[in-house]
């Protein structure tokens, strides 16, 4: 990668540096470079998913950002994790699905509002608020009555972000 030029996707692929691929995928001056960067990240989707289990905060953040940039292929994997994974992986999946703001994640996120883990319920409510889909109104209204006050508060915040959402009412 040159100091002032566009990111070198081929070099990033050859070295396996995810961070350089991410830099290329988010390069705004040349759509072809950005697309090549996204394609390189998509090829490493399994690695990115596995990195969600790391304790290295920097690698975790790079993996999260990369998965969001990859888009629909990563979304499908994250939706699966949201329904089947370990609770910490589910929490990560809920967070990233919210960052993606993809309507296809609304139903699985609504389902996770009923999970036993309060942090997962809270992150799912936040994600639904970021997506802003009217399809989440009823589940979020029910979540406003959650036994955990933090979950209920996040559900109310999410409802305020969705057109037609009236906080504090059950529908």
Language-model segments: residues:
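Structural detector for internal amphipathic alpha-helices that build alpha-solenoid repeat scaffolds
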Residues: 1-15, 20-53, 57-72, 77-83, ...
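Short, flexible active-site recognition loops that position polar ligands and cofactors
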Residues: 145
């Amino acid at each position: 990668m040159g100091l002032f030029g566009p990111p070198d996707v081929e070099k990033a692929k050859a070295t396996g540096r995810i961070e350089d691929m991410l830099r290329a995928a988010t390069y705004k001056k040349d759509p072809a470079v950005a697309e090549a960067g996204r394609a390189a990240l998509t090829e490493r989707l399994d690695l990115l998913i596995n990195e969600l289990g790391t304790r290295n905060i920097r690698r975790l953040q790079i993996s999260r950002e990369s998965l969001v940039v990859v888009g629909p292929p990563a979304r499908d994997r994250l939706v699966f994790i949201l329904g089947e994974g370990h609770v910490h992986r589910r929490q990560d999946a809920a967070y990233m699905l919210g960052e993606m703001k993809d309507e296809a994640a609304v139903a699985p996120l609504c389902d996770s509002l009923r999970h036993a883990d309060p942090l997962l319920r809270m992150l799912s409510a936040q994600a639904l608020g970021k997506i802003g889909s009217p399809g989440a109104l009823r589940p979020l209204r029910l979540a406003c009555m959650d036994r955990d006050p933090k979950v209920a508060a996040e559900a109310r915040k999410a409802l305020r972000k969705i057109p037609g959402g009236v906080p504090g009412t059950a529908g």
